[in-house]
Amino acid sequence: MYQSIYYSYNGEDKGTCYLRDDKGGWSSFKYYPTVYKLDPDGEHVTLFGDYCSPIRGKFDWNDPTILEKDIQKELGVLRDLYYKDDSAPTSHNTIYLDIEIEILGTLTPQSIRDANAKITSIALIDVNTSKKYCYILDDKQSIEPVDKDNKKIIPCFTEQELLSKFLDLWIELDPTVVVGYNSDFFDIPYIYFRMRKILGEELVLFLSPIKKINDNIYNPHSPITIGGVNSLDYMLLVKKYIMKEEPSYKLGDIGTKYAKLGKIEYNGSLDRLFRDDPDKFIEYNLRDVEIIEALENKLQFIKLTILICHLCHVPYDSIYYNTVLNEGAILTYLKRKGIVSPNKPTTTNKSIKELNIGDEIQHQRGTPTIEGTITYIDERGGKCQIRTKSNILKERSLKTVRKKDSYAGGYLLEPTPGLYSYVSDADFTSLYPSIIKSLNLGVETLVGRIVTKNNYEQYNSLEQLKQLNPEDQLDIEKLNTKTYNLKKGKIRVKDLIELIEENNWSISASGAFYRNDIKSISCEVLEDWFKQREHYRELKKKAGKQEDWENYKLYDLYQLAFKILQNALYGTYAINGWRYTDGYKICSASITNSGQRLTKESILFINGKLENLVNNGRKEFVIASDTDSAYVELKDLLNLKYPDITDEGEKISKLIELSQELITDANQNLDNISRKVFNIQRKHYFELKQEVIVKKAYWSGKRRYAMWIVNKEGVPIPPDHKDALDMKGLDIMKSNFPPLFRDFGEELIKKILFDTSKQEIDKYILDFRKSLDTIDWRKLLKPTGLKKLDEYIAKKPAAGEIFSKLALKCPTNTKGAIYTNDLIRFKKQTKQYETFQVGDKMYLAYLKENPYHVDVLGLNGYNDSPEILEFVEKYIDKNQMFESVMKNKLENLYQDLKWGAVIFNNNVNKFFTFS
């Protein structure tokens, strides 16, 4: 089975594929893909049912009847050579890697590319032997070499020696997979650029076993590809596989949370640690790779990635792109069936390209974030220029960006803020995959659609059509799958209804209709994945009963891999350039709008059902919803049915019974919806289930809540269990709070959920605020970032002045950065201490009245001027630090709970004036 693949698109060996296999080792060969031309007398059949014949050799790229001409070469090779086998390799040479460099300032794509700072140490772990290595720069020759206990410390007199010895080990270990943390952005490119600068162009190529290294200047997130070596960034894998957003993605925080292993703590800067305590510096450097090792032992994201990539027959670096994963999987599935795939819609019809000038774009890798607006596109160069929200022009690779979604997402019911009791959920099982299967959705089953004003309309169902005037004319569109153009037309309402019912077409909430006489390939693949997942779940259970824990973990990985693939398919329909979509977001709108319609109809049914049962004037019992789930307060029904029950355990048991009855009725309602709304006359896959019972819940807004879960999937959850508390998005415990305040907010919410009295809550707040007087001031600093700087400097300091004049409405963080920069320049410390630049992370310190008459300063937290630190310690305003972070949040919380005003104390100024 393949271990790595590299295809040469340029140079003397253009068209050569380099392939490493766990049995055959390295091979290289010219790859000439087979393409297919539409031919009524051909022996092969396409996805759309047309006949075609194979062509080998040259062909006219602009000929729209030539199919499979735009398949990425790596995907073509892996499909053609391995389509009969989904297994992963029996072995890999994996290393965990981390580097440290001299202080460089802000890490930007350009500063990494310039690579002006020395590499001071390189730590790695060879997974095959578990041996740890640390190469450290030791120009003072004060460090003794170590080679014992499976750990080797190699001091090097010069950086050139360090890099040369590291390269020797790299060649010896011959890695197939290298794993770091934020390594695609920093470690890998920095090693390459610094090594090229110090060792030269020829030696740096030895990082690649085939002497091929790609430098993609337009992909700042992963600019370097080392041919023959798979680079996997654990930070990106954490963002991919851990669905909830983490408060922090720093390695130390993730390691502490998931592997109980954090960073080595130290005072001052890393440069100072390197100079003053090299032994601890070595320990610090090794700890980073030890954390990666511990994370992988716990989470097994590398193994999971390799499994998924081999199930999909794609290179490992494709793991971050669901479009590539799903394309590889379906290409392979169709190859096994002897079916020829279509070209991408954007290959056939250039006018529906994914990106246009003026589009808002977001990153495809990691957590999607809106970055800016496109101002220029260079399709041949594979790049675009964007203008960020900070009005800065940047270049980006077309492979790493996508257009901001322009279709409906999941339905979010706006909750009424407050505290709720005895809550149950109604959760759709795999909502989007079930919609694809129920509608028989696919580009080859898509018949046409009713023209809508936008991609957010949800009321073009069969039921709505029957309420229209039968003689009214509707605008419709049909997709021409040979040209990917939309053919427009008109049809009377009654004629369309007749066509839908006679042909048994399913119709989505957005007005697209799909044939059911053939099964779409997406449905086939989803059903295959579902069966495979169930198969491995059964094997996992069997292994668990036999206490075969090695296979238990393996089967668990396989079932998780298939779950991830199932849930990833729907999003690819929104990408115009995905091979198996329509190019107009018709299919994607069908999925998400139908999902919204199902959720809304279910909420309507549940509210109506409970209104009739309880009959107390209340009309809304569903508190909130989030894409595929709704939360229902059953307190009134519980009190009505069982008014005399006082035992809490018995209440929960009865609550489970009531919620199950409600779910049964709601599922019967889904049977009606599938027929009336979607015209699904056969089996549908829509299903609601009850998963959690919540004793107490607090909602402050959409996706902002805290729940005390007492039962999950029928299993009682004790209050101290890790699953007992589910908190998300609450303002009082934001990720950008100082940890001290964030922990206080979390504990406060816990107390509220656990029925602590208001009087005790009031006291808890007072005690916390009073405690700040004796707490280390550094724990109060507010973490933030610097987005703007120079535009808020109205006038630089004149002779004899210290501080700049600021423009109006200068943000507080910008003000703090400007004042600190001014102080550093005034004290002539710019060579020892860095000034703030746009993009830097920083900490804010609010100040009391002081000799400088400034109210805030910024600190970087690792290499601050001792004079500035001493000044901040003397004049920090702890009152203002509390007010800026917590005051409004606490007031909003009390308002949500209808507790009135927050009484911090009876005599605030006297009681809480910090020294």
Regions found by a protein language model. Name each.
Residues 357, 362-396:
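Basic/aromatic-rich interaction segments and small domains that mediate binding to polyanionic partners
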Residues 630-662:
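Catalytic palm subdomain of template-directed nucleic-acid polymerases
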Residues 660-915:
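C-terminal, non-catalytic extensions of nucleic-acid polymerases
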Residues 148-152, 172-176, 274-280, 412-421, ...:
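Glycine- and acidic
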Residues 18-21, 272-354, 399-450, 456, ...:
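Common nucleic-acid-contacting/processivity interface regions adjacent to the catalytic cores
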Residues 1-174, 287, 291-353, 400-409, ...:
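DnaQ-like (DEDDh/DEDDy) 3′-5′ exonuclease domain used for proofreading
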Residues 166-190:
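Proline-aspartate-enriched helix->loop->beta-strand connector
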Residues 132-135, 142-154, 174, 178, ...:
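Active-site-proximal helix-loop-helix substrate-binding element of RNase H-like nuclease domains
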